[in-house]
């Protein structure tokens, strides 16, 4: 028997659908909150990766909790070592290293899947962080340690291809680095523009979001804000 769907039209549609925030925007915003003062993110979806991000924030010493549909994050990170098992479960966990480097000068995490450094697509992240003064090594199988002995500084960085994750990592690192960072070959996805808008709301200075070249003037201290992340365009479609 043929499987088919028959849609009978002729009736006007009405009503409204609430679109949750996009997970791919929320995760870097949660990482960015470690750089800022008190942050409230509106209408955050209750997903497993969001719960893992909460655990990473708490593991770093930040206060993070739900208030209804909103996520509240406050307090600067105190611990440079991210919970290993949680970090392994989420590919975006590498994003949380950049704020730790910027604030504490050190970040330690398990790589997603517990793989060796060369086995995961984070080479663009690491190459850019090196240009900003970071040094990395493996403390054991799948365990990555990053340090910035003299602090992170601005740099001119060109990505080999427009990686969204690497662009987010380097924007996070540059937002509180010393000096100005110019990032060429950057990803142009809406989530990048959303991250820049959030950081600028928190008194960062980022220009060019949405284009392939970003200019980021580092600010040592960022304020907090209330922010509504980008709606999930996949859900909306």
Residue ranges and their predicted role:
Residues 1-237:
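Structural preference for solvent-exposed beta-strand-turn elements
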